[in-house]
């Protein structure tokens, strides 16, 4: 059932790593909610900075936050002012010492989250859903994707009956665990209601980390 399951969840521990890396016993639920608040705050504050994902690591009374973004200049601000203000706000939110790392996404057209959000924004601006999907597919293939599949669901073009339409190019092997598949969803708020956007991008094969370690030892 590789077609149904979230491709990232299926590959965690094989070729993908967790986005929250910490261990807790009694206060697990509190820390989990804290993670959600941190992510929610960052995504709201940096909604125009093309943030793809936020990784959180914890050690004692310290929180390390890694922000993956296509526009690092926007996150850092003039002379680092914006990132310092963000660090202080997160320290106040968590009550812990916060350290922020910023990682630039070199090819935003190969990042499923950014592609999905781009399609959603276009749908909100009344661009044809077919055109928005086809343009995203062309850009991803030009950027070096091995395959891409996009899907939009809802009242497309203001139709009375909701439906789903998908377009794809290349291959997207969802069953192959060593296939590096990025997957993301986004929502477009249109005058007719919400339209859901899903994007799968196949970026090539990756050897599982265990195999890499074994080969290194030989």
Curated annotation (Swiss-Prot):
GO terms for molecular function: mRNA binding; rRNA binding; structural constituent of ribosome. GO terms for cellular component: cytosolic small ribosomal subunit. The keyword Ribonucleoprotein applies. It holds the Pfam family Ribosomal_S3_C. GO terms for biological process: translation. The keyword ATP-binding does not apply. Residues 38-106 form the KH type-2 domain. Coiled coil: none annotated. Keywords: Ribonucleoprotein, Ribosomal protein, RNA-binding, rRNA-binding. PROSITE patterns: KH_TYPE_2, RIBOSOMAL_S3. Part of the 30S ribosomal subunit. Forms a tight complex with proteins S10 and S14. Binds the lower part of the 30S subunit head. Binds mRNA in the 70S ribosome, positioning it for translation. Belongs to the universal ribosomal protein uS3 family. This is Small ribosomal subunit protein uS3. It comes from Geobacillus thermodenitrificans (strain NG80-2). The gene is rpsC.
């Amino acid at each position: 059932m590789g077609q149904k399951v979230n491709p990232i969840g299926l590959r965690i521990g094989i070729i993908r790593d967790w986005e929250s890396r910490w261990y807790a016993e009694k206060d697990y639920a509190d820390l989990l909610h804290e993670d959600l608040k941190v992510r929610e705050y960052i995504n709201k504050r940096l909604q125009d900075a093309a943030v793809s994902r936020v990784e959180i690591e914890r050690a004692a009374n310290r929180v390390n936050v890694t922000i993956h973004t296509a526009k690092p200049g926007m996150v850092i601000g003039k002379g680092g002012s914006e990132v310092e203000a963000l660090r202080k706000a997160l320290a106040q939110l968590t009550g812990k010492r916060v350290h922020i790392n910023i990682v630039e996404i070199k090819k935003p057209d190969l990042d499923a989250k950014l592609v999905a959000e781009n399609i959603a924004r276009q749908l909100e601006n009344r661009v044809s859903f077919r055109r928005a999907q086809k343009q995203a597919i062309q850009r991803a293939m030009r950027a070096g994707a091995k395959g891409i599949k996009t899907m939009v669901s809802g009242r497309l073009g203001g139709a009375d009956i909701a439906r789903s339409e998908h377009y794809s190019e290349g291959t997207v092997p969802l069953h192959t665990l060593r296939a590096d598949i990025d997957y993301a969803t986004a929502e477009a708020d249109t005058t007719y209601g919400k339209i859901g956007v899903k994007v799968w991008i196949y970026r090539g094969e990756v050897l599982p980390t265990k195999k890499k370690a074994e080969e290194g030892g030989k």
